[in-house]
Amino acid sequence: MTTPQHLSDRYELGEILGFGGMSEVHLARDLRLHRDVAVKVLRADLARDPSFYLRFRREAQNAAALNHPAIVAVYDTGEAETPNGPLPYIVMEYVDGVTLRDIVHTDGPIAPRRAIEIIADACQALNFSHQHGIIHRDVKPANIMISKNNAVKVMDFGIARALADTGNSVTQTAAVIGTAQYLSPEQARGETVDARSDVYSLGCVLYEILTGEPPFIGDSPVAVAYQHVREDPVPPSRRHADVTPELDAVVLKALAKNPDNRYQTAAEMRADLIRVHEGQAPDAPKVLTDAERTSMLAAPPADRAGAATQDMPVPRPAGYSKQRSTSVARWLIAVAVLAVLTVVVTVAINMVGGNPRNVQVPDVAEQSADDAQAALQNRGFKTVIDRQPDNEVPPGLVIGTDPEAGSELGAGEQVTINVSTGPEQALVPDVAGLTPTQARQKLKDAGFEKFRESPSPSTPEQKGRVLATNPQANQTAAIINEITIVVGAGPEDAPVLSCAGQNAESCKAILAAGGFTNTVVVEVDNPAAAGQVVGTEPADGQSVPKDTVIQIRVSKGNQFVMPDLVGQFWSDAYPRLTALGWTGVLDKGPDVRDSGQRTNAVVTQSPSAGTPVNKDAKITLSFAA
């Protein structure tokens, strides 16, 4: 099942921005609000798994409840209907920027003052979420973005959980949730966590952006988790000279093993960071320098100059004897010899007795590369990672192994882990100006297979030609993605607006507001006042292409409407006609007998009543005899 390119007839998916363990994030266009958004879609292969489905829904609920400038906003959620069932998605604010992980990988450590500013803003975001009863549980550099205007944005509440839910069975299991290098000790032990766990993880992030590497590094996630629980971190200043002792103190307090010894809230950590930023001493305990440690451990001065140093006698308990000391030493030697003999015998059996013990290669398909490596190394195999494109398996997850799962190998032999880099990528060619058929062929030649045409208004010259593509030309995209080919449909149709009764200039403005800019003024014979618009061609209300030339019909003011003169005497009819502006001549028709009208009254007239007549036109009247 593949991800549809259109969701709910509103969101058009574009290029993939990134992948997570259970989702993929697309740049998308909100067709209703005409803005770019980021759309996170649950991986199609996980949509049918109730646990992943509920976890994804929980992320949407958690993030939607958090409205803060330093937290990526959630605009909408929904489910797309697919042949295999509903596919949930989350519509989020699109942040045009880079993650802290990318910054450190590309540019190395961040200057301490800037690092303090970034983490202080992240503290605000986390403190806001904690106040609303939600802990993040996966704070790491990849989940903190810096936008192009330097705004800090915390994102991905994918494994966040409401504090009110922390007593349920999911949280209490021994399953470790989060990323190994940023786990709090209580997370690593599978214990219930609270907001102080996020403080620890944020301390790990601060450590990494100051020094260029996380506080603990190991060959496997298990090894790193062990260090979080058991080992103290090296002060950041020993790895990067620009870190001050005051900043050391803040980092190490955030990284305290016991949650009670850490900052109790993200707000407390932010307050100490601001103090350090302003050149003040933090509330965190001071971290001693090497010189200060040496000074404290130096021997006190002798009571008097030149006094000889003597070994102090060691008191021994009653009954202690030299014979007992000797027997203990012999016992320790015997244990050591036995351990060495065990190793020698084991090696001899393997060398003389035949092949080493065979071990079955476990199935690690669709696990993360780190988890797969740990599983294989725990079986005694050496591992090497080979990254390759795959159209089915999401990036960062294992395609398979070589030898394949189920094979039996000798312990210590090498297994190649094939890790997906995602679908094969290709550069979208520029097909603007081509016909749709030509564009499809050019896109096929570039490696793409799925296409969809979308009409869009254009100039007459662009009608039937490609205007653009989505993804855009010269961008890389997965070859399995559908390419939208935007084809010119010619000028957009619009109704002609009415401007009757206006003057010509006002009419032009009204038509331009409706999208019609090509107009011509035509004077016509009409009874209306001179200069008054009496209509348009095409007539108002008609829908026509916006590039249509609209005739604005303006009255010459040279006509009047012929009145009904039948039954009137000429002495009455003449004043009526002149009052209407008539300046023409009377054409007297033949008299009419037996008309029923009074003698000399008008019996017939031409033009007939109600007809527009030029003011200088000839009028024919017949009178009763």
Swiss-Prot record:
The active site is at 138 (proton acceptor). It is a single-pass membrane protein. The chain crosses the membrane at residues 332-352. Residues 353-625 are extracellular. Residues 597-611 have a biased composition (Polar residues). Residues 11-274 form the Protein kinase domain. It is an enzyme of class 2 (transferase). Residues 355-421, 422-489, 490-556, 557-625 form the PASTA domain. InterPro entries: Kinase-like_dom_sf, PASTA_dom, Prot_kinase_dom, Protein_kinase_ATP_BS, Ser/Thr_kinase_AS. Its EC number is 2.7.11.1. Keywords: ATP-binding, Cell membrane, Kinase, Magnesium, Membrane, Metal-binding, Nucleotide-binding, Phosphoprotein, Repeat, Serine/threonine-protein kinase, Transferase, Transmembrane, Transmembrane helix. GO terms for molecular function: ATP binding; metal ion binding; protein serine kinase activity; protein serine/threonine kinase activity. ATP binds at residues 17-25, 40, 93-95, 140-143, 156. Residues 1-331 are cytoplasmic. Autophosphorylated. Dephosphorylated by PstP. PROSITE patterns: PASTA (PS51178), PROTEIN_KINASE_ATP (PS00107), PROTEIN_KINASE_DOM (PS50011), PROTEIN_KINASE_ST (PS00108). Disruption phenotype: When depleted (with anti-sense RNA) no vancomycin-induced degradation of RseA is seen. GO terms for biological process: regulation of primary metabolic process. Residues 302-321, 591-612 are annotated as: Disordered. Mg(2+) binds at residues 143, 156. One of its GO terms (cellular component) is plasma membrane. The modification Phosphothreonine is found at residues 171, 173, 294, 309. NCBIfam families: PknB_PASTA_kin. The PASTA domains interact with peptidoglycans and are required for PknB localization. PANTHER family: MITOGEN-ACTIVATED PROTEIN KINASE KINASE KINASE 20-RELATED (PTHR43289), SERINE_THREONINE-PROTEIN KINASE NEKL-3 (PTHR43289:SF6). This is Serine/threonine-protein kinase PknB. The gene is pknB.
